[in-house]
UniProtKB/Swiss-Prot annotation:
One Pfam family this sequence matches: Queuosine_synth
Protein name: S-adenosylmethionine:tRNA ribosyltransferase-isomerase
EC number per UniProt: 2.4.99.17
Biological process according to GO: queuosine biosynthetic process; tRNA wobble guanine modification
Function: Transfers and isomerizes the ribose moiety from AdoMet to the 7-aminomethyl group of 7-deazaguanine (preQ1-tRNA) to give epoxyqueuosine (oQ-tRNA).
SUPFAM superfamilies: QueA-like
Pathway note: tRNA modification; tRNA-queuosine biosynthesis
Enzyme class label: transferase
GO MF annotation list: S-adenosylmethionine:tRNA ribosyltransferase-isomerase activity
Keywords of the record: Cytoplasm, Queuosine biosynthesis, S-adenosyl-L-methionine, Transferase
Designated gene of the protein: queA
Length: 342
């Protein structure tokens, strides 16, 4: 079988010390590895120098906003419960949500949280997932009211590889400066490096566009099939404004900030759908056909994200750059350093 289709071909070893548990401060001082595909040149710099390397291009950001999706409560028996909200079921008649719950629970069980919030377990699904309904003062909560309540009692859902509890600083650090549309349970992390000053300087030379893709918990789901083509990609809600669609439809060069932007642009390019659910899986055998440049962080081994990067530059080249980044002590994952692919 083609090695590009083998899960084991996307593996690498990373020392725990290179997993960033906190962002660089100030954030634009994070390191940046620049790879020029045309000339096969590599540059090591800092993120604040990003503009020095950018060609003439439109820049696309994901303006999704992370909700405080993790809450702690109790069962009627007093046993402790941790609930991680994934997403609403948008087509259900009653407001129902998909959630992951730690602890043994039964169908129709009621769980209790702060602010008189109650959760009824409607259905037990696979992989620890549950279909649930939220109540406050015996009234069913819709998405908007639930998100408002979670803002009071919830916790920022840090990724599983950050081995600490969320802190006050994460409220700001794990949210991009242009985040506005609530619905993500993970941050589009390439966006986290940008400061207001950097963004203002970018606007002087580049047109900036926003789209929304609500990053789901599926972004952390590991690929388990040795033939990656058998992997079932998670689905995430997206919306692209008309003005952004017109740029995608043009011949203007595009820099996508983050893998979520890339998947949204490429899904639209293939389907001409401006609003819906994206389940596009990009890898070397299904490469991008529209986006020209990519800004992204360093991703987990065997993840769909490292496969997406490989779709841009080839699997072997991707692994070589990761090997170099490890040698040069770059910081990895959500709070880590960045890579610019030209």
């Amino acid at each position: 079988m083609n090695k590009d289709l083998l899960l084991s071909s996307y593996d690498y070893t990373l020392a725990n010390e290179l997993i960033a548990n906190y962002p660089t401060n100030p954030k634009e001082d994070a390191r940046l590895l620049v790879f020029d595909r045309k000339n096969k040149e590599i540059f090591h710099t800092t993120f604040k120098n990003l503009q020095d390397f950018l060609p003439n291009c439109a820049i696309f950001f994901n303006d999704t906003k992370v909700i405080k999706a993790r809450i702690y409560g109790n069962k009627a028996s007093g046993g402790k419960i941790e609930l991680f909200l994934h997403q609403p079921f948008l087509n259900s008649h009653n407001p129902l949500f998909l959630a992951q719950i730690k602890g043994r629970i039964k169908k129709d069980e009621i769980l209790y949280f702060k602010e008189d919030l109650k959760v009824r377990v409607v259905e037990l699904l696979n992989d620890g997932l549950r279909k649930v309904q939220f109540f406050q003062n015996d009234k069913t909560l819709d998405t908007s009211n639930l998100y408002n309540l979670l803002d009071k009692i919830g916790h920022i859902p840090l990724p599983p590889y950050i081995k600490r509890e969320d802190e006050k600083s994460d409220l700001k650090d794990y949210q991009s400066i242009f985040a506005k549309n609530l619905g993500a349970v993970a941050a589009p992390t390439a966006s986290l490096h940008f400061s207001e000053t950097m963004l203002e300087n970018l606007r002087k030379k580049h047109e900036i566009y926003h789209l929304t893709l609500h990053v789901g918990a599926g972004t952390f789901k590991s690929v388990e099939c040795e033939n990656i083509q058998e992997h079932k990609m998670h689905s995430e809600f997206f919306n692209i404004p008309q003005q952004a669609c017109e740029i995608i439809d043009s011949k203007q060069a595009i820099l996508g900030v983050g893998t979520t932007v890339t998947r949204t642009i490429e899904y639209y390019t293939r389907t001409k759908t401006k609003n819906g659910f994206c389940d596009l899986f990009l890898h070397p055998q299904n490469p991008p056909i529209r986006q020209n440049h990519l800004l992204t962080n360093f991703h987990l081994p065997k993840s769909t994200l490292i496969m997406l990067v490989s779709a841009f530059i080839g699997r072997e080249q991707c692994l070589k750059l990761y090997e170099l980044a490890i040698k040069e002590k770059y910081r990895f994952y959500s709070y880590g350093d960045a890579m610019l692919i030209l």
